[in-house]
C-alpha cells in the first residue's frame, strides 16, 4: 500500500513517534523524510486540518518533536531537524488531499507505467471507490479533448500541486486566516524554519 507521507521504514517509524505529538498540538503530519549526508536532516512538513500554518507554529512543532525524539531516541547518528509548511505547490500525500484540492492542477507519478506512461498532469477531479480500491480522478487533455482518468491511490509514487494564480490566491487566503501578515509575507521564511533545537540534537549526538 502506498504511503506518500513516509516512504522508507525509518520514515514510517519516525512518523509513528511524532504524529501523535503533532496532532496533540492541533496539526497534521503531511510528510516526513530523513535525508542522508554528513549530518542527516530530518524534514517534517505539517499543516492545520483546515490549512494555514505560520512560523511560530513550526517552532512549536519543532520543540515538541525534539523533546519526544530525545526520549525515544530512534536515530543513532546526529541529525538536523527542519520543520516547514507544505508550501504553495504542496505535495499531496493523503487521500483527503485529492478531495481538498479538487479543481486545482497537479502532477502525479505512478510506481509502474500505465498505458506506457508514469507521469500525468491535469486537474484534480476528486476521489471515488474503484474495484481495486480508492481512485484519484484526474481531468487530462488528450487530442484536444478533456477526459477523466482514475488512478488507484496505491499506484502513486509522487503527487504535487502545480503553481497557478488560483492556487496562490487560495494559499494566501489560508495563510491570512492563520495570522500571517500578507503585506509582509516572506515566502522563504514562512515555508521553512530550521530550528536551533534540531541543531542541538545533532550536537548532542556527535
Swiss-Prot record:
Which keywords does this chain's UniProt record carry? Cytoplasm, Ribosome biogenesis
Query: Does the UniProt entry include the keyword Cytoplasm?
Result: yes
Q: Name one GO cellular component term.
A: cytosol
InterPro entries tied to this protein? Ribosome_maturation_RimP, RimP_C, RimP_C_sf, RimP_N, RimP_N_sf
GO biological process annotation, one example: ribosomal small subunit assembly
Q: Which CDD domains match?
A: YlxS_C
Which Pfam families does the record cross-reference, listed alphabetically?
DUF150_C (PF17384), RimP_N (PF02576)
**Chief localisation class:** cytoplasm
**Entry superkingdom:** Bacteria
Cell location: Cytoplasm
NCBIfam families referenced in this protein's UniProt entry, alphabetically: PRK00092.2-5 (NF000932)
Function, please?
Required for maturation of 30S ribosomal subunits.
Give the record's family classification. Answer: Belongs to the RimP family.
Know the name of this protein? Answer: Ribosome maturation factor RimP
Name its species: Paracoccus denitrificans (strain Pd 1222)
Quick one: which gene encodes this?
Answer: rimP
Amino acid at each position: 500500500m502506498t504511503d506518500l507521507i513516509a516512504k522508507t521504514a525509518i520514515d514510517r517509524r519516525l512518523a509513528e513517534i511524532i504524529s501523535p505529538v503533532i496532532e496533540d498540538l492541533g496539526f497534521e503530519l503531511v510528510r516526513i523524510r530523513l535525508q542522508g549526508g554528513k549530518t542527516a536532516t530530518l524534514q517534517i512538513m505539517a499543516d492545520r486540518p483546515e490549512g494555514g500554518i505560520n512560523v511560530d507554529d513550526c517552532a512549536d512543532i519543532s520543540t515538541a518533536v525534539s523533546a519526544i525524539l530525545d526520549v525515544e531516541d530512534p536515530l543513532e547518528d546526529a541529525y538536523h531537524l527542519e520543520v516547514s509548511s507544505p508550501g504553495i505547490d504542496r505535495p499531496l500525500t493523503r487521500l483527503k488531499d485529492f478531495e481538498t484540492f479538487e479543481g486545482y492542477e497537479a502532477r502525479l507519478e505512478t510506481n509502474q507505467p500505465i498505458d506506457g506512461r508514469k507521469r500525468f498532469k491535469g486537474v484534480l477531479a476528486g476521489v471515488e471507490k474503484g474495484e481495486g480500491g480508492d481512485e484519484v480522478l484526474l481531468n487530462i487533455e488528450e487530442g484536444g479533448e478533456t477526459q477523466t482518468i482514475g488512478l488507484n491511490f496505491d499506484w502513486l509514487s509522487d503527487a504535487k500541486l502545480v503553481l497557478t494564480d488560483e492556487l496562490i490566491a487560495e494559499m494566501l487566503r489560508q495563510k491570512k486566516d492563520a495570522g500571517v501578515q500578507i503585506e509582509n509575507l516572506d515566502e522563504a521564511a514562512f515555508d521553512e524554519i530550521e530550528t536551533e533545537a534540531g541543531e542541538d540534537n545533532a550536537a548532542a549526538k556527535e
